[in-house]
Amino acid sequence: AGDCSTYDKKSIWSIPVGSNKMNIIKTEIPEVVIIEPIVRGDSRGYFMESFLKEKFEREVKSTIFVQENESISSYGVLRGLHYQLSPFSQSKLIRVVTGKIMDVAVDIRKGSPTFGKWVATILSGENKRQLFVPRGFAHGFSVLENDTVVQYKTDNYYAPEFEAAIRWNDPALSIDWGLPVSDIKLSEKDKYHPMLADARLFDYNENLYG
């Protein structure tokens, strides 16, 4: 059965000014991490550091991002659950520039103590949070507002021949996408992915960063 750890948004203006430039928030799946930049605003607008390599490598994961992608989507669009197989497996660091999504990471490492469990968190242009999804996980998101712009970094290049995916509504996962099912809009491709039980997966003991 699936499992969920959901973290709701926090207003960027409620974050206290301190010496740290971003907060690292652990989820119930230890490898999946929420990153919350410290935002400083006044009447002119705001400023934040959206990525700090040294802090990220020290507190999250030592990896090198090589590609950044951007999409814009309307309300109800659902993309996922996507991943790439070895040797082109990818970590992702996802953020929302404008709008709001429910962002989901699913552990698909056979033998993992959290295999088949998932984390869901709201990322928005307001809360400025980011989600780190490591290799060995499937990723997807549902769009909760029109004209939502999503950016994400990856630590491996896009390799279409190594693409894989799991059905968004697999009952073994029972993911809550935060939308009425009748509002969900899918690509033709995303409608017909295999269920978790039939998908190509990772092994927990495999060194995906080797």
Residue ranges, per PLM feature:
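Non-catalytic, conserved peripheral segments adjacent to functional cores
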Residues: 21-126, 146-147, 154-210
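Conserved metal-binding segment of the jelly-roll/cupin
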Residues: 123-146
